[in-house]
Amino acid sequence: MKLRIRTMIWAAVLAVCLAGCSATGISGGTSDAGQVTTDFLEDTVFTVADMRVSLAEWYLYALPQAAEIENMYGTEIWDYPTDSTGQTMADALKEDIREQITYIKITGARAAELGLSLGEDDLFDINLQTEEYMSSLSEEQRLKYGITEDAVRQIYSDNVLAMKVYENLTLNIDTSIPDEQVRHMVLEYIMILKDYEDEDGEFVRYSDSELDSMRSDAEALLEQVLADSSITRLDEINDDRYSVVELVADLAELKEKLPGEIPEIAFSMRQDEITGVYETDDALFILDCVERTDETTTDKARIEIIEARQQALFEKKYGEWENEAVIKYNYKLWDSLGVR
């Protein structure tokens, strides 16, 4: 899948395939607390291996995210404590941004060893998006935060390379998935409960004779449905005694919502099959397989499973890279750094 660079820089950082990685507890490599701040250029926030993160780059990540949070919660949110240690919302976002940048830097740095680089189309898109982004900023914004075309271009380039690395490493992931794990069906069913609620709110079991009558009525209804060619779905039955429930689910979800052997029976039904009457301890069931395979939900589930496999594979590899990375902070700048 070709990455479409977003006009909002931070959205590219959180692109679907790379989203959530900072939330998994990535520590951002090995911190070198003994680094002397005079070793840094004045506007360097920190370095990841030999890669420098400038103040302008920091703000390009931070400002859009801070603005979105303020739009949602107001400007007072920054002093709000997020945990028992006294960490504030501003502290939490600062750490999250550091993790985002570190993640992109470490990942993109592996492009060369994998034989990956920016192609002509990538460079064209990067330059175009850089121009568009720069044109959206006022001169005051550029000067206040030191934002330059080079800084913007660097972020777009880093993100494209990181995406290329991700796709390269996860391209050949196993995509075979057992039917029972991924297939979603559309099931309609009538559930006839064996209990009723009395005036005191207590559930009372129907008498044996009443249950026999309910079974006979359900069997007669099923016979009527199967004999009437104009009825193709349970919800086409005109009988006020029964309500029809529709459920779109895989086998695991069927097991969560339906009792006994009903899930396995339903999941094995043929397309358009109406069958019953099945009995559990608490109810009678008539089942209708409206769609044996619901393509939309099945495809969505398949994609989610494959993406989870890709993410797990990539995070394992990233963990190895992270252990090799050394992060050095310009504490003179870092300690006073905000997100606005």
Segments and roles (model prediction):
Residues 22-43, 50-53, 81-340:
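Peptidyl-prolyl cis-trans isomerase
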Residues 11-15:
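Short, compositionally stereotyped local motifs that mark structural "simplifiers"
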Residues 68-84:
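Mixed-charge, low-complexity intrinsically disordered segments
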Residues 2-9:
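Bacterial N-terminal signal peptides that target proteins for export
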Residues 16-20:
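C-terminal motif of bacterial Sec signal peptides marking the signal peptidase cleavage site
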Residues 44-47, 67:
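Surface-exposed, interaction-prone regions with an acidic/low-complexity signature
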Residues 55-72:
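Short, solvent-exposed beta-strand-terminating loops
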